[in-house]
Amino acid sequence: MKKIWFHLDLQFFASKKGVGSTKNGRDSNPKFLGAKLADGQQAKTGQIIYRQRGNKIWPGKNVGQGKDDTLFALADGIVRYTKFLGNKTKVSVVEQSK
């Protein structure tokens, strides 16, 4: 009996399609964080001074902090940014005398 040899050539195809472009096509909406009023600008009561996540800037006199860490004016006056404890920044609203 004569032996017969078979040459098998196997090819494996991808079981999952390469979908990098569809998986990467997302982007979040802008949050518009940062300073809304600069040092020396006039602030009215309730006006947003600084939008932030966490305490990048700390509230000082006449400045309140919302639950999303937004800083806002509690009184009419001039916005002042000052450094304290070395590298921390505090924002205050200085009331003007009438």
UniProtKB/Swiss-Prot annotation:
The protein here is known as: Large ribosomal subunit protein bL27
User: Which residues form the propeptide in this entry?
Assistant: 1-13
Name any one GO molecular function: structural constituent of ribosome
Keywords (A to Z) from UniProt: Ribonucleoprotein, Ribosomal protein
So where does this one cross the membrane? none
Q: Which InterPro entries match?
A: Ribosomal_bL27, Ribosomal_bL27_CS
The highest taxon in the source lineage is: Bacteria
Sequence similarity: Belongs to the bacterial ribosomal protein bL27 family.
| GO terms for biological process, alphabetical | translation
Q: Which residues form a coiled coil?
A: none
Keyword field contains NADP: no
